[in-house]
Amino acid sequence: MNNDVFPNKFKAALAAKQVQIGCWSALSNPISTEVLGLAGFDWLVLDGEHAPNDISTFIPQLMALKGSASAPVVRVPTNEPVIIKRLLDIGFYNFLIPFVETKEKAELAVASTRYPPEGIRGVSVSHRANMFGTVADYFAQSNKNITILVQIESQQGVDNVDAIAATEGVDGIFVGPSDLAAALGHLGNASHPDVQKAIQHIFNRASAHGKPSGILAPVEADARRYLEWGATFVAVGSDLGVFRSATQKLADTFKK
């Protein structure tokens, strides 16, 4: 039986520097995720860091996206091999790794997603990702089809951006604007010139190493500016933000 995720089209699109417009999924619900999957986004982040997600909530959401053209990307809660292994086994192939501050942390993220001898991923012969043992040549195919996107969101990460971007197996550099703003002394103000300068610097250094860059930008003007600066995978909103904004607007229409 063939697995329809091989080859990984999202990974190929990033390598080809094709613009990929995405959305954040934070509601942790298969119905809302399914709706997002019908909207036409190129990729969707299922958030395991700041949203109330775990293995039991991720699986129904992956099922809900089975027929969608939107590539599911999981943001892991932390850069830890056992957590990453479990998310691989349930069927994720695209990973967003938070707080990568050094080349060594980038290398750990890559190694955690590869089977030996290329990495340290633990081996199970039957799990959801290999359709319970029915995918031919799964081990080799998996190693070639994992996407690793690393988040730079601290001063140390900015300082080490060249080493991180040059790491073999890293497919893209993603900026975490809120944490980066906090790290630079501008908590709650990602629009501060210092933060914007750092973001543009990260984009430029990623490009210098032939790596695409991305960011979360729910404000349209910000998203368009980042695209002009060379970002190629940009999340332009979140299900939670759209839901809150739309329901507030609807209530205000009749209550004010």
From Swiss-Prot:
The record marks 89 as: Increases basicity of active site His. GO terms for biological process: D-glucarate catabolic process; galactarate catabolic process. Binds 1 Mg(2+) ion per subunit. Pathway: Carbohydrate acid metabolism; galactarate degradation; D-glycerate from galactarate: step 2/3. Keywords: Lyase, Magnesium, Metal-binding. Its EC number is 4.1.2.20. Its cofactor is Mg(2+). The record marks 75 as: Transition state stabilizer. The keyword Metal-binding applies. It catalyses: 5-dehydro-4-deoxy-D-glucarate = 2-hydroxy-3-oxopropanoate + pyruvate; 2-dehydro-3-deoxy-D-glucarate = 2-hydroxy-3-oxopropanoate + pyruvate. InterPro entries: Aldolase/citrate-lyase_domain (IPR005000), GarL (IPR017648), HpcH-HpaI_aldolase (IPR050251), Pyrv/PenolPyrv_kinase-like_dom (IPR015813), Pyrv_kinase-like_dom_sf (IPR040442). Catalyzes the reversible retro-aldol cleavage of both 5-keto-4-deoxy-D-glucarate and 2-keto-3-deoxy-D-glucarate to pyruvate and tartronic semialdehyde. Homohexamer; trimer of dimers. NCBIfam families: GarL, PRK10558.1. Belongs to the HpcH/HpaI aldolase family. KDGluc aldolase subfamily. This is 5-keto-4-deoxy-D-glucarate aldolase. It comes from Escherichia coli (strain ATCC 8739 / DSM 1576 / NBRC 3972 / NCIMB 8545 / WDCM 00012 / Crooks). The lineage of its organism: Bacteria, Pseudomonadati, Pseudomonadota, Gammaproteobacteria, Enterobacterales.
